[in-house]
Amino acid sequence: MSARFYGVISPFITPFREDLSLDREAVAWLARYQAEKGVHGIFPNSTTGEFVHLSREEAVEVTRLVLEAVGGKVWVIPGISANYTEDSVALGRTFKDLGVDGAVVTPPYFFKVSPERLKVHFSTILEKVDLPIIVYNIPATTGINIPVGLYLELAKEHSNLAGAKATVESFTYFRQLVQVVKAERKDFAVLTGLDDLLLPVLMMGGDGGIMALANAAPQIHREVYDAYRSGDLKRALEAWHKLLRLVRVYDYATSFPTSVKTLLKVMGAPVKPYARTPLTPETREVEEKIAQIARELGLKI
């Protein structure tokens, strides 16, 4: 049985106007653009989408706009992360009613709970939300590194645990997800959250990634994915090296959201570079460095 979710998924940025209100037209445009450029799925209300800066109503509105824009062409898998378990449940049920394809959830990110309490948190959500759910490990922001053993327990006990997104730099962690959890549940998706690990994770037996730069240039990620899946390792390596050149954007920017928004701006997209405070737009100097990368790779709308 193949994984429920796979390939190239974008953690959707949230476009804002200069007054930091939602830019609904840009949301719809960007969702259509990503679908046309080859993403398999879109993850609104994400880390890159500044979900911690959105009200519940805004999270629902962005997800609704994305659903309408893509019209069923790609998966829509919104985030339901919250510090209170029942808030995640309520948001998941709301998204279920909207017609989404799944959901993504991180650990609580304020109180650092024990593995036992973390299992209760995820189990409650998996039991109460009737959707395929990706459990997202991002210790840099949550302060919690989800043990591989916990994924295994959840995978055995909850058939709607669809997989793991892991934003970690450890090859060992991904190897264990594949060899321990995926060996138990063949339909368990192993997804990287880091653009530059896409090919290594695929080669270890993973299924793809949910990567920030897929907001702007998912065609490069697709080139890596498609070449590897077709058995053309030479072409996959060439595409991966192109992706590694694009990843330099992160070397200059101050955050994932602003790096992507700046890249889209210099590519000519109708997406403004504004982010909600304490994040702020990148400086003109950073913008020019990112523009140079885009020019080198021939990226323009």
Swiss-Prot record:
Q: Please report any disulfide bonds recorded for this protein chain, giving both cysteine positions.
A: none
Q: Which GO terms describe its molecular function?
A: 2-dehydro-3-deoxy-phosphogluconate aldolase activity; 4-hydroxy-tetrahydrodipicolinate synthase activity
EC number of this enzyme: 4.-.-.-
The UniProt entry lists the main location of this chain as cytoplasm
What the entry lists under CDD domains is as follows:
DHDPS-like
Q: Name the top EC class.
A: lyase
Which UniProt keywords are listed?
A: Cytoplasm, Lyase, Schiff base
TM stretches of this protein: none
- Which InterPro entries does this one have? Aldolase_TIM, DapA-like
Recorded hits in Pfam families, A to Z, give:
DHDPS
Report the subcellular localization.
Cytoplasm
- Cell inner membrane keyword on record: no
Catalytic residues at T47, Y136, K165
What would be one Gene Ontology cellular-component term for the protein? Answer: cytoplasm
* UniProt similarity note: Belongs to the DapA family.
What assembly does the database describe for this protein?
Answer: Homotetramer.
The protein's name: Uncharacterized DapA-like lyase Tpen_1666
Q: Which organism is it from?
A: Thermofilum pendens (strain DSM 2475 / Hrk 5)
Q: What is the lineage of its organism?
A: Archaea, Thermoproteota, Thermoprotei, Thermofilales, Thermofilaceae
What gene name is given for the protein in this entry? dapAL
